[in-house]
From Swiss-Prot:
Known cofactor(s): Mg(2+); Mn(2+)
Main location class: plastid
Protein's name in the database: (+)-3-carene synthase 2, chloroplastic
Binding residues annotated for Mg(2+) 3, in chain numbering: D529
Gene from which this protein is expressed: TPS-(+)3car2
Taxonomic path: Eukaryota, Viridiplantae, Streptophyta, Embryophyta, Tracheophyta
Function: Monoterpene synthase (TPS) involved in the biosynthesis of monoterpene natural products included in conifer oleoresin secretions and volatile emissions; these compounds contribute to biotic and abiotic stress defense against herbivores and pathogens. Catalyzes the conversion of (2E)-geranyl diphosphate (GPP) to (+)-3-carene.
Chain span(s) of sequence motif DDXXD motif: 377-381
Gene3D superfamilies: Farnesyl Diphosphate Synthase, Terpene synthase, N-terminal domain
Record remark: domains: The Asp-Asp-Xaa-Xaa-Asp/Glu (DDXXD/E) motif is important for the catalytic activity, presumably through binding to Mg(2+).
Keyword terms, alphabetized: Chloroplast, Lyase, Magnesium, Metal-binding, Plastid, Transit peptide
GO cellular component, one term: chloroplast
Family membership noted in the UniProt record: Belongs to the terpene synthase family. Tpsd subfamily.
One Gene Ontology term from the biological process aspect of the record: green leaf volatile biosynthetic process
Length: 626
């Protein structure tokens, strides 16, 4: 059985659409609402139920249970999803619009030594780059973006940059926007440039007259501060100043595009932002501005292309989600009643960080890997006995179907879906990498399961480790490495050994990403984990190491560690002197952002909160109105 199916992309026309008009669009939202109401009653019984076929409920073994709700998404509803945007005519229309947007980029070029653009040419080009990136359509304009940034960078100085090449003064808005874009694209820029925008007291300050330009300038300063590297004190100061200023501004600003942009960045900072969610949000903002004002032709063209691209990928998402549903059903995953069934939520996350239609194999591999991680997590954390888990761990090291002979019945199915899926993904990776990568993945899997077994033994014996002991093991059990390694190997991007060393364990990149996931996950889950009998967490271990400390003390320390790790991860991702180019690290970094997104405010992974359900609806189930 092929576990990574060849998914039809945006090429086949679907005969009937749920989205071809406002009426049908409204009907889809009502169907989703009705579905959620009907499923809500089923998810109230949160404790895990065991079936004799899968969980040995009649074996007389006392087992711990989880407190997870059931799958929220009805099978028939998933299978009924359809979209007309896979038709070739939409792709042809998108190609024409792409050509027209390229002409906009080219209109800023120089002919016969004369600039064909207004006096604010630098800001205009930065605006174009920023907008195509926020709208999720930048992959079509990589050459144009490079030309634009190379041109603007020629005018960059230690004191910043003005809105035009002939500007007599630098300004904060253009400088902050340029700094952020340059850093994200690997250009060398120093944060010391912002020292020139402080007052005589050495502090950031705003004028008494609040204007939209001033608010926009501080907004771009705040965005720039979020990609700080370690020891950049000026960006720490900029973040504090900008955050306070913008929070106050939100109290007085009318509801507008700018206020919604500010709120979005507060809600989803760069390290937990999903590009597709940002695209959806920014499309809505620009669309509202178009209705309420008189947009220029460039904005209208960008918006038209962004909407069309969003909906074309929407048709891809539906096919891939249905493919995952078949895989999930064929392997009998719904019958494993002790696990969290979150394939829809996982797919939403993964398609939120990669919107390239041709990357179907990456997305499917990533979702399947995350679902396998969930099965193992729930089996080791709650359901399996310590003796069963030792048998399973030994079987994984053997890596042979015959190893199932000594396993309990429910574990045999778990072992085989793990074995077959990992092997099938390794075959896909071999096509991309031109070498066998199964050895890499098996070692990562053994390390991962070994860390789970250690935690299971702690639970079984009542042992509470030191903070450092728990943290080091927790970086492995976070699952970041296994969630990242095999999926990125299926990409067409080459990952020779020297580049893989910069991303995979024991690289600093992997260490910081795994640390963030472990620490943030614990701050969101420690109360629920403790209720299930899992005494060890970053919070409890810190308090045990430091008698007299409180939960608040532990959380303050851990939140500080997370902020520090985010800056270190930024550096490992964007450092210009790294052996691995940014393009090679981008997917691994975005997986880290996606996983962090699940824990943005709460455990959106175990409990599909309103925010999680809204995310599924806005980025997967619901198209944008053209």
């Amino acid at each position: 059985m092929s576990l990574i199916s060849a998914v039809p992309l945006a090429s086949s026309c679907v005969s009937k659409s749920l989205i071809s008009s406002v009426r049908e669009h409204t009907a889809l939202r009502r169907a989703i609402a009705t579905l959620q109401m009907s499923r809500r009653g089923k998810s109230v019984a949160a404790s895990i139920r065991m079936s004799s076929a899968t969980a040995g409920s009649d074996d007389g073994v006392k087992r711990r249970i989880g407190d997870y709700h059931s799958n929220l998404w009805d099978d028939n509803f998933i299978q009924s999803l359809s979209s007309p945007y896979g038709a070739s005519s939409y792709g042809e229309h998108a190609d024409r619009l792409i050509g027209e947007v390229k002409e906009i980029f080219n209109s800023f070029s120089i002919a016969d030594g004369e600039l064909i653009s207004p006096v604010n040419d630098l800001l205009q080009q930065l605006w174009m780059v920023d907008n195509v990136e926020r709208l999720g359509i930048d992959r079509h304009f990589q050459t144009e973006i490079k030309v634009a940034l190379d041109y603007v960078y020629r005018y960059w100085s230690e004191e910043g940059i003005g809105c035009g090449r002939d500007s007599a003064f630098t300004d904060l808005n253009t400088t902050a926007l340029a700094f952020r874009i340059f850093r994200l694209h690997g250009y060398t820029v120093s944060s010391d440039v912002f020292e020139h925008f402080k007052d005589q007291k050495g502090q950031f300050a705003a004028s008494a007259n609040d204007t939209e330009l001033q608010t926009r300038s501080v907004f771009n300063l705040f965005r720039a501060s979020l990609i700080a590297f370690p020891e950049e004190k000026v960006l720490e100061e900029a973040e504090k100043f900008a955050a306070a200023y913008l929070k106050a501004a939100l109290q007085t600003l009318p509801v507008s595009g700018l206020s919604r942009e500010i709120q979005y960045v507060f809600d989803y900072r760069w390290h937990s932002n999903l590009p597709r969610l940002e695209a959806r949000s920014y499309i809505d903002i620009l669309a509202d501005n178009t209705i309420s004002g008189t947009p220029d032709a460039n904005t209208k063209k960008l918006l038209e292309l962004a909407k069309l691209e969003f909906n074309i990928f929407h048709s891809v998402q539906q096919k891939e989600l249905q493919c995952l549903w078949r895989w999930w059903k064929e392997w009998g995953c719904p019958e494993l009643t002790f696990i969290r069934h979150r394939y829809v939520e996982f797919y939403t996350l993964v398609s939120g960080i990669d919107m390239v239609p041709e990357h179907a194999t990456f997305r499917l591999s990533c979702v399947k890997t995350c679902h396998l991680i969930t099965i193992l997590d729930d089996m080791y954390d709650t359901f399996g006995t310590i003796d069963e888990l030792r048998l399973f761990t030994a079987a994984v090291k053997r890596w042979d179907p015959s190893a199932t002979e000594c396993l309990p019945e429910y574990m045999k199915g778990v072992y085989m879906v793990l074995y077959e899926t990992v092997n099938e993904m390794a075959k896909e990776a071999q096509k991309s990498q031109r070498r066998d990568t199964l050895g890499y993945v098996r070692q990562a899997l053994e390390d991962y399961i070994g860390s789970y077994l250690k935690e299971a033994e702690w639970i079984a014996t009542g042992y509470v480790p030191t903070f450092q002991e728990y943290f080091e093991n927790g970086k492995l059990s976070s699952g970041h490495r296994i969630a990242t390694l095999q999926p990125i190997l299926t990409l067409s991007i080459p990952f020779p050994h020297h580049i893989l060393q910069e991303i995979d364990f024991p690289s600093k990149f992997n260490d910081y990403a795994a640390s963030i996931l472990r620490l943030r996950g614990d701050t969101r889950c420690y109360k629920a984990d403790s209720a299930r009998g899992e005494e060890a967490s970053c919070i409890s271990c810190y308090m045990r190491d430091n008698p007299g400390s409180t939960q608040e003390d532990a959380l303050n320390l851990i939140n500080g560690m997370i902020e520090d790790m985010i800056k270190k991860l930024n550096w490992e991702f964007l450092r210009p002197d790294n052996n691995a180019p940014i393009s090679s690290k981008k997917h691994a970094f975005n997986i880290s952002r996606g996983l962090h997104h699940f824990y943005n405010y709460r455990d959106g992974y175990s409990v599909a909160s309103k925010e999680t359900k809204d995310l599924v609806i806005k980025t997967v189930l619901e198209p944008v109105l053209m």
